Amino acid sequence: MNRPAWLMARPVAHRGLHDKTSGLIENSCAAAQAAIDHDCAIECDIQLSADGDAMVFHDFTLDRLTNQQGRVDSMTAQQLSSLQLVGSQDTIPTLTAFLELIAGRVPLVCEIKSRFDGDLRLLNRAVDIAKQYQGPLVFKSFDPALVAALRRIAPDMP
């Protein structure tokens, strides 16, 4: 596979340019904006909500970054989007909202989180959203089955 030149053209801010002491929480819109302001590409993580939307959040549980407990996939996108991230005014963004903020200004590396159970709903939702996006975007996953499915579902995506 050919690696797009834009992928390595600038530093990549892992989960955005976050700094908890400054209220810039990982995978938040504020951390994404900070990365954009510093001309960094952004790496983010996505997970599936209970109602099938792609949410930008790293952990499988809410405990570390919100005042809620439980699994991310047990709440709807609307519920998750209303949860404030600890130490900031930000809430958990949908992938759609995250892409609207980035608006192609910097490249995005989007990690599709997996429980290694063969569930392709998040992958399918992410690809559907990405097809509407005009900016530089690449998906990654540590789940080989998801990567193989991505090659089948969207062979032209980097």
Model region roles, listed by residue range:
Residues M1-P158:
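Phosphate-group recognition and catalysis centered on beta-loop-alpha active-site segments
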